[in-house]
């Protein structure tokens, strides 16, 4: 169980980084366009 949770945590962190990258860029462009 410990190893499975560790792998899931790593996968979740990787997915979060992968999704957060474009999301931050989108927010920056959106705010720049809004301003």
Swiss-Prot record:
Record flagged with keyword tRNA-binding: no
Main location: plastid
Top-rank taxon, per record: Eukaryota
Signal peptide positions on this chain: none
Membrane topology: Single-pass membrane protein
Example of a GO biological process term: photosynthesis
GO cellular component: organellar chromatophore thylakoid membrane; photosystem II; plastid
Keyword Thylakoid: yes
UniProt keyword annotations, A-Z: Membrane, Organellar chromatophore, Photosynthesis, Photosystem II, Plastid, Thylakoid, Transmembrane, Transmembrane helix
Compartments it resides in: Plastid, Organellar chromatophore thylakoid membrane
Transmembrane segments: 7-27
Family to which the UniProt record says this protein belongs: Belongs to the Psb30/Ycf12 family.
Complexes and interactors: PSII is composed of 1 copy each of membrane proteins PsbA, PsbB, PsbC, PsbD, PsbE, PsbF, PsbH, PsbI, PsbJ, PsbK, PsbL, PsbM, PsbT, PsbX, PsbY, PsbZ, Psb30/Ycf12, peripheral proteins of the oxygen-evolving complex and a large number of cofactors. It forms dimeric complexes.
Function: A core subunit of photosystem II (PSII), probably helps stabilize the reaction center.
Protein name, entry field: Photosystem II reaction center protein Psb30
Organism encoding this protein: Paulinella chromatophora
